[in-house]
């Protein structure tokens, strides 16, 4: 028997997801890096059905002086979620978030404070420091973190609007390596938990959603696929299927078989073992 959840988070209900005043009917968050060209970017975003698109602030032209990835985004259809990818300390992440707010006019920010360029794992101390400061400055912080449940709790207590634990290292395609940690985090916080990073294929998305995650953020899983457009459709469908399965409730795992057909009124063939 499953233990009861602590509280009843609104995002567990069969309702649209709300983060920072934005309402999302799609629970798939999609990044804009690594696509072959602008046309492929547009197509994949449209096919995925995403309503929230992440943009690496340090890797796009925000000046308006030349071609920019932002030109490919439909601001009527997509909420732009600027992220601080490429920042390795709290100070640079804070500066990047402030720049994004000034240029894009949004208080939303996906906070990333990375530990090193090889693993791209989040730095916990810098992440806590930057979260505290950005919340104090009025940002709606969606924070990328490890799958450590206690760290996720601390970030939620600091005022993060959503906690985004890594399923596995960024771009690794390893999927959700520690589903038990994600489940524990879901038990401990009432803000949305969005699994972020490491998604390699549609089944990874389905698993994250079946665990009870409020959403999944991915980029490489679509952009680096052999057929990105087809994979965008697969990720979209997996997100929906996983959410529906979670809401429906899976049957418990059992050691022994349990016949699905009723035994009452069973007709036994005469002469067979076990029959009258």
What are these regions (language model features)?
Residues 1-15:
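Basic/polar N-terminal segments that are highly enriched at the extreme N-terminus
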Residues 14-19, 33-55, 64-79, 87-276:
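Alpha/beta enzyme core
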Residues 58:
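Non-catalytic, usually N-terminal nucleic-acid engagement modules in DNA/RNA processing proteins
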């Amino acid at each position: 028997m499953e233990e009861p959840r602590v509280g009843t988070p609104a995002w567990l209900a069969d309702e649209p997801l709300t983060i920072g005043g934005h309402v999302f009917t799609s629970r798939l968050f999609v990044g804009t890096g690594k696509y072959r060209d602008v046309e492929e970017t547009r197509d994949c975003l449209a096919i995925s059905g995403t309503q929230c698109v992440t943009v690496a602030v340090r890797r796009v032209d925000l000046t308006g002086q030349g071609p920019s990835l932002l030109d490919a985004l439909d601001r009527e259809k997509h909420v732009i979620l600027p992220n601080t990818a490429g920042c390795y300390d709290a100070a640079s992440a804070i500066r990047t978030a402030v720049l994004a707010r000034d240029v894009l006019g949004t208080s939303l920010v996906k906070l990333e404070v990375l530990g090193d360029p090889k693993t791209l794992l989040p730095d916990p101390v810098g992440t806590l420091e930057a979260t505290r400061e950005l919340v104090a400055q009025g940002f709606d912080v969606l924070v990328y973190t490890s799958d450590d449940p206690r760290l996720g709790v601390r970030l939620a207590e600091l005022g993060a609007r959503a906690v985004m634990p890594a399923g596995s290292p960024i771009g690794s395609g390893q999927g959700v390596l520690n589903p038990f940690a994600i489940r524990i985090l879901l038990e401990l916080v009432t803000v949305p938990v969005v699994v972020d990073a490491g998604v390699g294929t549609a089944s990874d998305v389905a698993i994250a959603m079946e665990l009870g995650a409020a959403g999944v953020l991915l980029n490489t899983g679509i952009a680096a696929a052999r057929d990105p457009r087809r994979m965008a459709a697969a990720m979209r469908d997996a997100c929906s299927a996983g959410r529906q399965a979670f809401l429906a409730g899976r049957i418990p795992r059992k050691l022994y078989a349990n016949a699905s057909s009723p035994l009452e009124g069973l007709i036994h063939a005469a002469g067979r073992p076990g029959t009258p």
